[in-house]
């Protein structure tokens, strides 16, 4: 794999489109990729393509990149396994859940984390429910999307206060998109919602958030046999480096990111988006090493403890650090030092 320095000029978006002039995006390393190579990246809600396009990180790529949007981690995984996509962007829970169900052909090649933050997860109560504390949820209806990071945070918050999600409350399992309308209709007493949803619901009482439970892990995954294709391996390495650069761009262009993502995609005000951004910041990319793998393992362990998965899953066979040098080089070029993962 040949790595050479590359400077990409981030032009192509006007000041009106981007919320201000974009600075030059620098890419630490470029991989030599055979002509005609194509990558399809499966994402959710534009979380890969939006920063990629805003930062113009794809300028000069020696391969074709197409983004395809899916609803939920399970759909992304299915796209990878069917061959409809080469790279998938998902959260912390889907890989351990898939492994527990017998899926062994996936591997994580990129990992972001943001431990110590809420993760934008809020357990909220209906104002008319009589619920003021988590302890008040005993016997109450609590909505969450099963098999997700929100599921794990909900169970973890209840456990901290002496309650078991499976036995001490009435668990209401819903698809992610159904949680907010169900809560708004008064069909449940409490629900775990995302930051933008909290504001869209009119700022209901917050009982707890993801701090101390959330890892902020987001993963880039591939089907294992894709790593047997030298052309794809080269293209994926180059893509990952550019994805790190695009992610780091967000932190140096915070107002533009808030406007483009929180306001235009998530549908909340600039002030609300800025507050969410300032509370949690950006999940940095980390090398896949002993420390980041250990953090990922806490997710699998948490899913088992909450009963989301039946068996204990060892995540170490499902991570691959072959691109660590690319991640480290890009972070160093951008002056990014990810927070320590040591407990």
Provide a role label for each language-model segment:
Residues 301-343:
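Conserved C-terminal helix/tail region of periplasmic/extracytoplasmic solute-binding proteins
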Residues 18-164, 172, 209-214:
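Short, glycine-/small- and polar/acidic-enriched structural segments
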Residues 1-2:
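N-terminal export leaders
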Residues 89-102, 155, 185-205, 295, ...:
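A ligand-binding cleft/hinge motif common to bilobed small-molecule-binding domains
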Residues 6-10:
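C-terminal motif of bacterial Sec signal peptides marking the signal peptidase cleavage site
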Residues 12-15:
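Bacterial signal peptide processing site
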């Amino acid at each position: 794999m040949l790595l050479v320095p590359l400077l990409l000029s981030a032009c192509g978006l006007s000041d009106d489109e981007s919320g201000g002039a974009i600075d030059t995006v620098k890419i630490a390393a470029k991989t030599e990729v055979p002509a005609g190579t194509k990558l399809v990246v499966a994402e959710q809600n534009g979380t890969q393509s939006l920063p990629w396009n805003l930062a113009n990180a794809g300028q000069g790529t020696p391969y074709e990149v197409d983004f395809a949007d899916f609803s939920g981690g399970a759909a992304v995984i299915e796209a990878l396994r069917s061959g409809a996509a080469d790279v998938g962007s998902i959260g912390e829970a889907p890989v351990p859940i898939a492994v527990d169900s017998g899926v062994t052909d996936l591997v994580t090649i990129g990992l972001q984390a943001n431990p110590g933050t809420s993760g934008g997860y809020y357990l909220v109560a209906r104002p008319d429910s009589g619920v003021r504390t988590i302890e008040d949820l005993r016997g109450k209806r609590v909505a969450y999307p099963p098999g997700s990071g929100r599921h794990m945070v909900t169970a973890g918050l209840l456990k901290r206060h002496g309650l078991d999600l499976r036995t001490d409350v009435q668990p209401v399992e819903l698809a992610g998109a159904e949680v907010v309308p169900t809560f708004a209709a008064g069909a449940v007493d409490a629900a775990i919602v995302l930051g933008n949803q909290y504001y869209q619901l009119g700022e209901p009482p917050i009982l707890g958030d993801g701090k101390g439970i959330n890892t902020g892990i987001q993963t880039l995954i591939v089907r294992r046999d894709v790593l047997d294709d030298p052309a794809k391996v080269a293209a994926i390495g180059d893509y990952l480096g550019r994805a790190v650069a695009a992610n780091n761009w967000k932190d140096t262009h915070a107002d533009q990111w808030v406007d483009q993502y929180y306001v235009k995609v998530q549908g909340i005000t600039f002030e609300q988006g800025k507050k969410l951004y300032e509370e949690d910041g950006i999940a940095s990319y980390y090398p896949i090493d002993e420390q980041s793998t250990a953090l990922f393992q806490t997710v699998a362990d948490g899913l088992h403890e909450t009963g989301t998965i039946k068996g204990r899953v060892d995540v170490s066979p499902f991570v691959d650090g072959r691109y660590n040098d690319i991640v480290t080089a890009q972070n160093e070029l951008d002056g990014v030092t990810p927070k320590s993962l040591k407990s």
